[in-house]
Regions:
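Outer membrane beta-barrel transmembrane domains
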Residues: 117-123, 225-257, 273-283, 296-390
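Transmembrane beta-strands of outer-membrane beta-barrel pores
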Residues: 66-72, 104-108, 141-143, 152-156, ...
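Hydrophobic, lipid-facing positions within transmembrane beta-strands of outer-membrane proteins
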Residues: 82-86, 131-135, 161-165, 202-208, ...
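Outer-membrane beta-barrel translocator domains and adjoining extracellular loop/strand segments
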Residues: 73-79, 111-117, 151, 158-166, ...
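Repeated loop/turn-to-beta-strand initiation elements of outer-membrane beta-barrel proteins
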Residues: 96-98, 143-148, 173-178, 216-222, ...
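Outer-membrane beta-barrel "beta-signal"
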Residues: 167, 217, 382-396
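Short sequence motifs at beta-strands and strand-loop junctions characteristic
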Residues: 56, 78-80, 125-129, 138-140, ...
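Membrane-embedded beta-strand positions of outer-membrane beta-barrel proteins
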Residues: 62-64, 100-102, 148, 178-182, ...
Length: 396
């Protein structure tokens, strides 16, 4: 997972914090961990970038981060992920910027304790790795910017390639930015158990959004995305798991940032709504407080609440009555109904000569009973995770 937090000079510009993160995929072996670290809103092929910058960067930078992730359920440690990543941005001219990222994930542990229809509760061992890279070129023109990106990710049984193009239009007073983007992804799934070989999945993504400076101290951003995919969505490692071969996703994200001159701090609020054709609806609420401190330090505590309904074809354990072979069915608890809280804190320090460092700690706790407006899916064990990410950066 990669993310950036950049400020673009003007007071209103520095209030926005744009995170582009890969969304979760419940058929990828790495997804039990990555689903917790992703926002499920970005187009594939878009690298971490200050999406509302209205001019080419005049300085380059390089960032190195290391993520340590672990999750568990009662009586069982599950997935461990160790993930170094590298991000860089270089201005090639006054109007052209290149940027890219590389990430390596080493994954080990056990799959979720889901209910296997043939043998009861199961937590099979998982060992995998993922390597991924992204590259993007952005050209700044008179009152607009055009970006082209490419992305590739490889696991032992999963290959993904994607590309995107985006178009941003700036108002004359530079207080408003319109954003439009289109992306496409081509995935191939070849599980080690041979259930399928080189099974395809193709996806098209569309984004439209606006960022508006409301005043010198406040800014709002709202994006909608729509995705349409066709291909293999079932989990080959779960017995009888059968999912539709088409999936569409609609998502709406709104962020609001308010600067307070007294404490020289920024309140960051966000809300995301997502609905997919599998029948699941999710809502995510997040609040963060960014507080600069003396001597180049800053701290940013945050709290996120996430809730989702179950997919139409999710069945609660034990093995459901009336099951018909060949019908859509899953016991994957990631498609169950639940709620989750994620408290986190980020600490950063700037040094001389363009150096900086940061550390983020987060804890995730998931329970069925925390579903908003419902009781959640019965028979699902509580799920917990924690991750620590440390980084160092140099601008030049």
């Amino acid at each position: 997972m990669a993310a950036t937090d950049r400020r673009a000079g003007a007071r209103a510009s520095k209030l926005i914090d744009i995170d582009y993160e890969r969304g979760p995929d419940a058929t990828s072996p790495a997804s039990p961990a990555r689903a917790l670290l992703a926002a499920a809103l970005a187009l594939p092929g878009v690298v971490p970038v200050d999406a509302d910058a209205q001019a080419a960067a005049d300085r380059g930078s390089i960032e190195l981060k290391y993520l340590d992730y672990r999750d568990w359920q009662p009586g069982a440690d599950r997935i461990t992920v160790r993930s170094p990543s590298l991000y860089g941005v270089v201005p090639l001219s006054d109007t052209l910027v290149a940027e890219g990222s590389l990430v390596y994930d080493a994954i080990s542990g056990a799959s979720p304790l889901y209910y296997d229809t043939l043998s009861g509760a199961s937590g099979d061992r998982v060992t995998d790795y993922r390597t991924a890279g992204e590259f993007k070129l952005t050209k700044y023109l008179n009152g607009m910017a055009i970006g082209v990106g490419a992305y590739a990710s490889s696991e032992r049984d999963y290959l993904s390639r994607a590309g995107s193009i985006e178009w941003r239009i700036f108002s004359d007073d530079r207080n408003r930015t319109w954003a439009f983007a289109f992306g496409g992804a081509n995935d191939r799934i070849s599980p080690k158990n041979g259930v399928v070989v080189d099974a395809p999945r193709n996806t098209l993504d569309f984004l439209a959004g606006v960022t508006q400076a409301l005043s010198a101290r406040s800014i709002v951003q709202s994006n909608i995305t729509w995705s349409r995919g066709h291909g293999y969505y079932s989990d080959p490692y779960k017995s009888l798991d059968t999912r539709p071969t088409e999936r569409s996703v609609f998502a709406w994200l709104t962020r609001y940032n308010q600067y307070f001159p007294g404490p020289d701090a920024t309140l960051r609020l966000s809300y995301r709504y997502l609905h997919d054709s599998f029948g699941s609806t999710s809502n995510a609420f997040e609040a963060a407080w960014f507080q600069p401190l003396p001597h180049g330090w800053s701290v940013a505590p945050s709290l996120r609440y996430y809730t989702q309904t179950a997919a139409d074809f999710y069945y609660n354990p034990p093995f459901p009555e009336g099951f018909v072979a060949g019908q859509n069915y899953t016991a994957d608890t990631r498609l169950s109904a639940f709620g989750a809280f994620t408290p986190a804190i980020a600490i950063a320090k700037t040094f001389t000569e363009g150096w900086s460092a940061d550390l983020k700690l987060a804890f995730y706790r998931q329970r069925s009973g925390w579903e908003l407006g419902g009781d959640g899916s019965p028979g699902v064990l509580p799920f917990s995770a924690r991750w620590i990410q440390a980084g160092i950066a140099k601008s030049f």
